[in-house]
């Protein structure tokens, strides 16, 4: 299982490099199966989720090579349209197989996916989209099966701008007959990145990055080479780490336009932010101001940075308010932060944070971003912090201990 041991108080200085975006890599790797020829995908992070997905595709017969952050995929050897149920349960993104193989093979089956336990995350919107395109959908004892003789374009309104549903419907629609319109679509940069890859493959997609996406189906797609965008959540995590620890850190390989909401909040707290071509320089201030944060779908403040900024707010002067509107179980890290001395009160979907002197403690990561928050808390806490269940963290952060050590953090992984 492993754990991180962290001694707090070290100022962070230097340069830290951000990896490719996991949440872009997973749908793009799966989308490579849509093509009739191989693809080469660059800047893919070495993470457990990525490895699990590659293993799923290999078991389905696809040719997959993963080394030096490059994934090469040959879809021509694909023999199965069903994902291994044990592997699929470990990975929420395994549901993208449904949209891809429904479009290409007319049939797909997988078990209901896993991932972080941060609340009710149904795939109803995905299935509603598939049905609108003409698919038959069966859900039985945790197994999802989709079938269609020929998908036909449709106008689909999403009750909520779900990232997963937007991606899955877009994947299925690329090879459907006619035009598909997705209304109230999610606008995340990872969706734009996927659409850019699909377009190079020969797909006809317009409006990505807005709430209305239009897809004109094509008969076939060809493989392509594509470089994944930087991981904005990893970048945001390191920006917050720098702000916590009297930092003077250059966060390399960041697209600042993907982090406007975080940058605005950090500046509001009194932190110096300088946007450069290849990254963002963060210089901390001894006195941080309290701010209010409300999570929203992109381009609002990301729910995936809520737990991390909550740690930063414990070091601010004054009372801060955090309102979580995206996931209902996204405060699971709070009890662990309280073990370290954090003064946080929860009321429904809101958290009230007061200034706190954090001290080292034994804490447990309950999910990916909670784990990241506990690491950040350990970096600023007095004494030693032990973070357990780090398998959650390793699902989403490539070489996090080496990267943080490189800018002065005292962090090491032990068995």
UniProtKB/Swiss-Prot annotation:
GO molecular function: UDP-N-acetylglucosamine 1-carboxyvinyltransferase activity
Keywords per UniProt: Cell cycle, Cell division, Cell shape, Cell wall biogenesis/degradation, Cytoplasm, Peptidoglycan synthesis, Pyruvate, Transferase
Binding site for phosphoenolpyruvate: 22-23
Catalyzed reaction equations: phosphoenolpyruvate + UDP-N-acetyl-alpha-D-glucosamine = UDP-N-acetyl-3-O-(1-carboxyvinyl)-alpha-D-glucosamine + phosphate
Record's function text: Cell wall formation. Adds enolpyruvyl to UDP-N-acetylglucosamine.
Enzyme Commission code(s) on record: 2.5.1.7
PANTHER family assigned: UDP-N-ACETYLGLUCOSAMINE 1-CARBOXYVINYLTRANSFERASE (PTHR43783:SF1)
Encoding gene per record: murA
Protein name: UDP-N-acetylglucosamine 1-carboxyvinyltransferase
Signal peptide: none
Main location: cytoplasm
Ribonucleoprotein keyword on record: no
Gene Ontology CC terms, in alphabetical order: cytoplasm
CDD domains given in the database record: UdpNAET
Enzyme class of the recorded protein, top EC level: transferase
Pathway listed: Cell wall biogenesis; peptidoglycan biosynthesis
Subcellular localization(s) per the UniProt record: Cytoplasm
Family: Belongs to the EPSP synthase family. MurA subfamily.
């Amino acid at each position: 299982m492993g754990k991180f041991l962290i001694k707090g108080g070290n100022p962070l200085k230097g340069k830290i490099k951000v990896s490719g975006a996991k949440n872009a890599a997973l749908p793009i790797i799966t989308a490579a199966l849509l093509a009739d020829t191989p693809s080469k995908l660059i800047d893919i992070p070495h993470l457990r989720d990525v490895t699990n997905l590659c293993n799923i595709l290999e078991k389905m017969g696809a040719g997959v090579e993963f080394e030096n952050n490059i994934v090469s995929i040959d879809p021509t050897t694909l023999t199965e349209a069903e994902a291994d149920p044990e592997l699929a349960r470990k990975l929420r993104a395994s549901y993208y197989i449904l949209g891809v193989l429904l479009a290409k093979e007319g049939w797909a089956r997988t078990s209901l996916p896993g991932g972080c336990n941060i609340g009710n995350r149904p795939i109803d919107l995905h299935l509603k989209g598939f049905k609108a395109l003409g698919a038959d959908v069966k859900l039985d004892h945790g197994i999802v099966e989709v079938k269609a003789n020929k998908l036909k374009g449709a106008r689909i309104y999403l009750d909520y701008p779900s990232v997963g549903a937007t991606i899955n419907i877009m994947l299925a629609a690329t090879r459907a007959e006619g035009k598909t319109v997705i209304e109230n679509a999610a606008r995340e940069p990872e969706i734009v990145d996927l659409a850019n890859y699909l377009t190079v493959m020969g797909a006809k997609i317009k409006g990505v990055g807005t709430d209305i996406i239009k897809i004109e189906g094509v008969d076939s797609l060809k493989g392509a080479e594509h470089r994944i965008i930087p991981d904005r959540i990893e970048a945001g995590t390191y920006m917050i780490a720098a702000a916590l620890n009297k930092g003077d850190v250059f966060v390399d390989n960041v697209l600042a336009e993907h982090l406007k909401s975080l940058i605005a909040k950090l500046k509001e707290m009194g932190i110096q932010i300088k946007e450069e071509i290849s990254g963002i320089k963060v210089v901390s201030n001894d006195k941080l101001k309290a701010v209010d944060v409300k999570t929203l779908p992109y381009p609002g403040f990301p729910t995936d940075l809520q737990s991390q900024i909550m740690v930063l707010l414990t070091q601010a002067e004054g009372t801060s308010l955090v309102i979580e509107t995206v996931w209902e179980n996204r405060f699971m890290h709070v009890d662990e932060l309280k073990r370290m001395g954090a003064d946080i009160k929860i009321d429904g979907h809101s958290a009230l944070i007061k200034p706190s002197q954090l001290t080292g403690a034994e804490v447990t990561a309950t999910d990916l971003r909670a784990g990241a928050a506990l690491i950040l808390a350990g970096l600023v806490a007095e004494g030693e912090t032990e973070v357990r269940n780090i398998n959650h963290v390793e699902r989403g952060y490539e070489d996090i201990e080496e990267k943080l050590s490189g800018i002065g953090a005292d962090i090491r992984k032990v068995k």
